[in-house]
Amino acid sequence: MMTFNDLPEDLVVEILSRVPAVFLARLRSTSKRWNTLIKDGKLSKKHSSNAPRHSMALVLIDHKVYSVRSNLRGIHNSVAPYVNITCHFSLKEHLSNNYSTEVDIGHVFHCDGLLLCTTKDYRLVVWNPLSGETRWIQPRFCYKKDDCYALGRSSCNKYKILRQGRLINPSEERYVYNIVGEDLVINNSQERYEYEIYDFNSNSWRSIGVITGLFNPNITSGVSVNGITYWFDISEQFLLSFDFSTERFGSESLPEGDSHLALSVTRQGKRLCMLSTNYTYVTGTNVNLWIATKTSENTRAMSWSKFPILRGGVGLRYRCHFREGVSFFAYQVKEKIVVVSCHRPNRHSKDIIHIVENDKFIELDHHGAKPTHELSPTPRLLIYVPSLVQIQHGI
């Protein structure tokens, strides 16, 4: 009897090209043949055209990346939800003679199947956790602790990296403002930052301008949607964007009256969403989810739809979970919105995963990896859309 291993390779590629990438990840460890096929460029091209997009959640805990499996389907029928932190994606050290040495990750940024990782010792690497492919990015001069990075994609599907680096020496300033849109409000900070673009094809960095700092290095919740990257600006009053096609910054207004906490994307990574809080004397602190709906062609203003998540006030025990550093993703379950949020453990709770829905706050004692102590880095939860996309290699 013919087995799957006996099939011609072209037929196997055709079959696998229709399997969601999230399931292909499980095949990598089953045999060398599967692992080689998953890394193959021919399968990658077919897969991007044929396979449906399925998302999964990842979480960064104690410098390691894990997948998050959740079951929220029965939450409206009094069935207890659960979250498991399961598969550990291992980023290997390329400088070590021992390839089993694992790298500690300080920060991750997702764009269309690739993770841009800043290591604990400030190095930079682009990583596809699904295929295991990596590309270590060398700095123009040296790695710096204060550098911030974002990964994006141009309209011709070329990946680029944006770097924000603080200038120590005022003589380095060149005051180039051509990367700023006319509607962008420049803050009054005296600090100057240089912005550079890394081009994968030429394997090199180039400066695109020096202006006042636009996005706060302490706010690491930037997200990429359709190749454009968004952050809160340093004053947290505007939404800052960077278009990797035009290599220009822009800004969007944010809903008034709320304190803006974190950005995320919808399940398929196609729409921007935001978690915020507002306070009134009568109700106390309330939590809202905002989803970007469209951009006006005339004013280029972004429209938002508001979904109240937690009304009637957040108690003191839970208020600390909705501060800077929180990360989240949102699900739609039976026409209702459920938010899964993540924060560091604190004196009120050792749990880091929480569910907010229908004015209820649910703490989950999840299974799997957990921060080792209260001083561990803040866990980071993000939506990841697996892909077999290959990292562009330059000359």
Curated annotation (Swiss-Prot):
Residues 1-47 form the F-box domain. Pfam families: F-box, FBA_1. PROSITE patterns: FBOX (PS50181). SMART domains: FBOX (SM00256). InterPro entries: F-box-assoc_dom_typ1, F-box-assoc_interact_dom, F-box-like_dom_sf, F-box_dom, SCF_F-box_component. CDD domains: F-box_AtFBW1-like. PANTHER family: BNACNNG10540D PROTEIN, F-BOX PROTEIN CPR30-LIKE. This is Putative F-box protein At3g21170. It comes from Arabidopsis thaliana (Mouse-ear cress).
